[in-house]
């Protein structure tokens, strides 16, 4: 099981959830049963968010180099990099990439891509919005 942690400078990293290595399913840590968020296809690197009805395609991690691309409007955008050691870096144009967190016990780069889209990205985006309001 890949445990997903968000990096917090100067503090212990925050446990967000887990990625199942056999299925690529992602669960957010909650009180009581963990919440199923979506999945990463281990053979293709495609990431899907769980929805009622068809799942939503979010993007893909390339399994040969760990580059993560977001599928939004227009062409896919390079948004992150997953390293073989489980570390995940958010892409910043014309600046060093930000270290966002890690997947401990990662078996596939697809697990890291799923952790980025389904666990790390929502938390990072929410923190950026809150910082802008404060």
Map each language-model feature to its residues.
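Long terminal segments
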Residues: 1-24, 30, 44, 51-134
